[in-house]
Amino acid sequence: MNTKQLKSRSLLLLAVLLIASTAISWGAKPESIKKKEISKSFDVSLSDLLMTDNRYGNTTITHWNKNEVAIRVEIEAKAESADAAQACIDRVNIELKKSGNTVSAITSLKQQNWGNNNSNIRFTINYFISMPSKLAINLSQKYGNINLPDKNEGKSTIQVKYGNLNAGSFTQPLNLEAKYGNVDINNVTKANLDLGYCGNVSVGDAEQMNADNKYSNMNIKKCGQINLENKYGNIKIESLDKGYMEIKYSEAMIGSVKDELNVDELAYSTLTIKELTANFKQVNVDARYGNLNISVPAKASFKIAAENMKYANRHVSGFNITNSSTEDKVNHYYEINGGNKGRINFDGNNYSNINVKALK
């Protein structure tokens, strides 16, 4: 192909692209945008409470050193006509007030007939709030995200549905309900978590935690004590001192257990403990079609009781087994290095497996 032909083809391609882009722009309906902003400030003391209830947008909080809560709400509507966009703006009602010791920001939507163009109307309602870091908060957000600062020093109650929570640490108690979103928070002192259908839940260090986790995957770094009910979701804890759990239809992995672990039900699940420290007190697991895998330092002194193992597998390997016995063909007992300290109690309910191996 000579240079003249190549140039002609390039010009032809450019013409086609111009025609196509023009056709698209002619076919696209113009979009009208309407905006509204509401702002209000309130003097507060540290015994006051901030309460919000928003939807179809985000709630973003920042901290400052003033004894004041400043709330700014941005509403934006997009529609095929200016009248439709304005009608959408008019549908939104924002109530900002202080009553007693509670500063509140509440979103409500008036009922409105949109005709046949409902699918072409879009709007967002975003809260931007500045407040003292030690103020207590009660936040509710649907169809949007909650964004909090790095350090939150007031008691916190948070509900987020169909959106994400992004936050730093909580030095006071945290009560969280999260559904159909992701959760990313840093360290907590005391937390109660109600989680459902969350894609990923990430928590830093936790001193004490109660968690009801369903259809969600949760990752925790270091945890002092946890009370956990986990169903249809995987859980990973890097380090745990003490735990009380129910694990169903899940995969659970704990990097290390320092003190004790009690699992009232390990059902159709696998629990793996990568390191049970040498001075552990006890591990109690009641399994139903479950698998327990534990690694313990080879020089640790402890006992193992694996009971109701009729159709189950058991493996104890790599240790100095100083004594072992079997009762009724289904109950098996081991003493490791004299069996002087901790104890592993496993009820296999006939169909569950246990594997205990030595860490060199």
What residues fall within each predicted segment?
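Intrinsically disordered, low-complexity terminal regions
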Residues: M1-K360
